[in-house]
Amino acid sequence: MHHTAPDPTDAAADPARVTAPPGARARRRPLALALGLALPLTLVAACAQGAGSEGEQGDAAEPAPSATSDVSEAAALTPRLAITYDGGVQVLDATTLEVVDDLALDGFNRLNPAGDGRHLLVSTSGGFQVLDAGTWAEPHGDHAHYYTADPVLTDVTYAAEKPGHVVVHDGRTALFDDGTGDITVLDSATVADPHGIDDARTLTTPAAHHGVAVELSDGSLVVSEGTEDARTGVRLLDAAGDEVAANDQCPGVHGEAVAAGEAVVIGCEDGVLVVAGGAITKVAAPDAYGRIGNQAGSEASPVVLGDYKSDPDAELERPTRVSLVDTRDASLRLVDLPASYTFRSLGRGDAGEALVLGTDGSLHVIDPESGTVVRSVPVVDAWEEPEEWQEPRPALFVQDGIAYVTDPAGRAIHAVDYVGGEVWKSAELDVVPNELNGVTGKPATTGGHEADEHAHEDGEHGHDEPAHDEHEGHDHEHEDG
């Protein structure tokens, strides 16, 4: 099926800014320096309701409301993938790699996790539009019922002038608007609910910038500081919005990841900042210019994987070293690889393995504790990073113990067993894949792999030119990925 996405700029949809009702929750207090307004929610028509995380406890579980009436019950979870291409988004079955649906959507679009196991957030020219991947589970007593439906781009859009990073952590989803500095944090389970924003935590940074925010389980918030011209550091706010700690020794802030124990790592042009235990620690890079702008974290590991660039004058560096930041002692080590990589090359395995997709076509598996490359799995032909960060290049996405790798040159996608060291399934595509993301079909939960799924190069749309944080882990700036 081929759906046409509603126009997020439709004059009939007049987004209204709302703030969280007073007293609804203490954690929704705004930043001390600026009272923020809730991110506008655009409802073009009858909005699709999001999948609830709780099912009815009657004789039979009721499927969650869907944007389509074509709902089928399945025997098990049906994880799905989404890939962007020039002209739309294709949704695939993550097990068979077959195309489930093709959704038309013009423009350069980015895929972000929503955090509820069913939806994705598509960064468009109008904001963050909710994509229903059409797979979910409904708890029912001591078991669950599983459902599938046709994927659809819903009419729910969180309006943003320049949609930037999306960070999912501990059942909460944080959206950052680079054009205004507005931050909206809401329960992941309500992202697709047009009323979910009513209880959202909202705030605005003192100045608009390509930024990021991470909310932790106690309601504290790590938020970047900067302007359109320069990003300098981060602040740690408590649940009431009061400053607990701050550090302005992080030039070019970009990218974030959460490690075991809720330690947050923020990338800088000369190392990283580690936010843990209510304190912010600077970890210097071994080079005067050692940019880490894309990271991938895992709740299974205290070590965060990051990129590493050391040539401030390079237009396109093509790095061959990655960084491993140990949040236990705030230390940093570099690992040499046999090939370069890009901002879409970083991922984490279920056991915390550090995964890097190289331009040699292999998926390199690194032990984060020893820094040793334990295996390299050939996946695609050798390739070269394109000059423009928006151009398609092989991308890595890890879900449910499987590493998925796209091959734009071959118009294909591969599922890789990174533990067994083999490609177990491949499929041809009828489009040139660009971005890659997915959903498990499981309801929103706390914990899990953390990465800024909005890796970019630092430079554009959330990118800082030439440094790109792949929202990769997160370089949401042009290619400084």
Locations of regions flagged by a protein language model:
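Repeated scaffold domains used in trafficking and secretory/extracellular systems
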Residues: 67-72, 105-119, 151-171, 202-218, ...
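Blade-level signature of beta-propeller repeat domains, shared across WD40, Kelch, NHL, RCC1
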Residues: 408-457, 480-481
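Short beta-strand elements that form the blades of beta-propeller/WD-repeat-like
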Residues: 73-85, 112, 117-130, 164-185, ...
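Bacterial signal peptide processing site
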Residues: 48-51
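Long, acidic/polar, low-complexity amphipathic helices and coiled-coil-like
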Residues: 145-267
